[in-house]
Structures are given as C-alpha cells and as structure tokens.
Swiss-Prot record:
The keyword Cell membrane applies. This is Uncharacterized protein YfhP. PANTHER family: HYPOTHETICAL MEMBRANE SPANNING PROTEIN, MEMBRANE-BOUND METAL-DEPENDENT HYDROLASE. The chain crosses the membrane at residues 68-88, 92-112, 127-147, 148-168. It is found in: Cell membrane. May act as a negative regulator for the transcription of mutY, fabL, sspE and yfhP. It comes from Bacillus subtilis (strain 168).
Length: 327
C-alpha cells in the first residue's frame, strides 16, 4: 500500500490497542504503543530510499528483504527496544506484541497488491502478489479517515477501529469474489490452454487490468463494470539465445526488469550504429500504451551504451532517459 494508507493503518492499530487492558489503563503506555504502531507500519518501506540510487536497484529490492520474515522479527524488536529507552515503565511484552502486529499488518496488506512482496523469504524468494487491492485504495483510505474523525469526536478508538476492520474483511472478500468471476469469464473466452492469469486492480472499484499467458499467445485486456474485453493479443515468442540478447541480459536495468516482471514481450531493432533491445511489461496497459519497460542500446561490438528501466509514458521521454544514462 502507499505511505498514507500505512500511516492511517498504524493509527488504527494504535486505537485498537486501547482494548488491551495493559495499554488502555495507562496513558503513557498507550502513547508508546501508538508511536510503535506508527513506526511499525512504516518500517518495512525503508527500502524506498533505494530510489535515490537507481531504478534497477529499487525494482530488485523494494518490498524484498525488508518485508521478509527475518526483517519482520527485526523491526518488531528494534522499535520497542528504542522506545523502551524513553518509556522505561512500559510493559515491554505488550509493546513488542503491538509493534509486531503493526509490521505483520504492513506486510500482509502489501501481499494483496499487484506488486506483491517477498513475504515468505528466506523460505522462498518468490514474489507473493494476490492483486486484489490497488496500491492506493480510496475506500480503505477514506474509511480510515472517517474512523479517525469519529475517534476525534469522542468515539471509542478500540470499538471504532475494530468495527472498521471487520468491514474491511468483508471488502476484501468482495474483491476476491470479483476477481474469481473475472477468471471464470476468461476461461470461457480463451479456448487455448491458459498457463497464468494476472488480474491487477485499478483506482476504480469495478475496473481491472488483465494479462493472460497461454502456450502460444499473450492476451491483454480489461474488466469494466463486470464486462471482460480483450484489447491486445501478442504471439508468445521465446526470447532468442543470441549474442545480442545475451549481452542485453547482462545489463543491470534489463536484469532487474526480468527479475520483477512475470509477463512481458520483447523487441530487437537494428540501427546503423547499435542494436536496441526492449522488454515490455504487459500488466500495465494504459490508454493503448505499455508504460513499464526496460530498454538497452548495445553497440555492434556488443558493449552496453545506455539503458533504462521504469515507467515511461512517451517515446520522447524514454530517449531522454537513455541519453542521460549513456555510458
């Protein structure tokens, strides 16, 4: 989820914590727990600073190790340990438990995004992405703001936020049912044997992005108001084992893209003084354009000249990025 949603979830969890007698009966303890749940709700996203280095490092690592089981345990210990220095009278066990719950909740809700996390690392480096909830979901965010307003107006924080989360469980179940219906329709529409279906949510409640992989083709579509439409179809052509493609895969930007994207197509163009290899993620079609790409320019001597991976919405901007990234 986005930073703002994690913040309001941290506040909500701090409110629910007041139902714990150890927390609710001690204002200082309640204050410490609120700080802990806010910190715990943000800690796994500390890897966002990797954006300052480059997109390749960020794509490879964001929501990776910082969302893993060892990291969850680390955050749940270090945060209350620091807070205990300032709140020595706090009950450390309960402070730790609420911090742990905040970190676990952060990782858990991120699993439901299309991006996913490496939540089961170190047992597996697989990205777990259920694709039920958009990174920013208006209903989830606004409902949290409403609950915070009720608390501010004098409502019980514990009862208010606990009631909200019961409602949100129902909301997630509704999203799951919607996704399953789309999958059923896709199996009815596509007669080729389906290998995988990726359904990604959007900001709009009843609109989803679709990418289907079969043995021979990729199908890209949308589900709008319950109607599934296939917008593009691409032949599924294996990536060739050529010297140019081998050189491309050695580039950090290309390698990062391939480690992250589960469904993509590729293009190779030959120019007077270089080759251009392009990989295009098929999950994020927007207004007829596929904005998430990785591209590399390779000289005829197979040396990397420039490369880029990330979100690009015009060819002009892409070429500027490549010029800035020239080696």
């Amino acid at each position: 989820m986005d930073t703002g949603t994690h913040v309001v979830m941290g506040i909500a969890l701090g409110g629910i914590a007041t139902l714990d007698p150890v927390v609710g009966s001690d204002p200082a303890m309640a204050h410490a727990v609120m700080i802990a749940t806010l910190a715990g709700s943000q800690a796994p996203d500390i890897d966002t600073v990797l954006k300052l280095k480059n997109n390749a490092v960020y794509i490879r690592n964001h929501r990776g190790f910082t969302h893993s089981i060892p990291a969850v345990l680390f955050w749940s210990v270090i945060i209350p340990a620091i807070l205990y220095l300032f709140y020595p009278q706090a009950d450390f066990l309960h402070l730790w438990l609420w911090t742990l719950l905040a970190v676990v909740l952060h990782v858990f809700v991120d699993i439901f995004n299309a991006y996913g996390t490496q939540a089961i690392r170190p047992f597996s480096k697989k990205w777990v992405a259920l694709g039920l909830i958009n990174t920013f979901d208006p209903f989830i965010f606004i409902s949290h703001l409403a609950a915070i307003a009720i608390w501010y107006a004098g409502g019980s924080p514990g009862i208010t936020f606990l009631s909200l989360y019961i409602i949100l469980v129902g909301y997630y179940l509704v999203r799951l049912i919607m996704q399953l219906r789309i999958k059923r329709k896709l199996h009815e529409m596509i007669h080729d044997e389906i290998e995988s279906i990726i359904i990604s949510p959007t900001m709009k409640f009843r609109q989803w992005r679709i990418a289907v992989t079969t043995a021979h083709a990729f199908y890209v579509g949308r589900s709008m108001e319950g109607h599934v439409v296939i917008l593009d179809t691409f032949n599924r052509v294996p990536v060739p084992e050529t010297d140019v493609m081998h050189a491309a895969k050695q580039d950090d930007n290309i390698a990062a893209f391939l480690s992250f994207s589960p469904v993509y197509r590729w293009e190779v163009d030959t120019f007077k003084d270089h080759y251009e290899v392009r990989f295009i993620d098929l999950r994020y079609r927007s207004k007829g354009h596929y904005p998430f790409v990785a591209i590399v320019h390779i000289g005829h001597d197979l040396t990397i000249r420039s490369s880029y991976t990330g979100w690009i919405f015009s060819e002009e901007k892409l070429q500027k990025k490549l010029k800035l990234g020239s080696i």
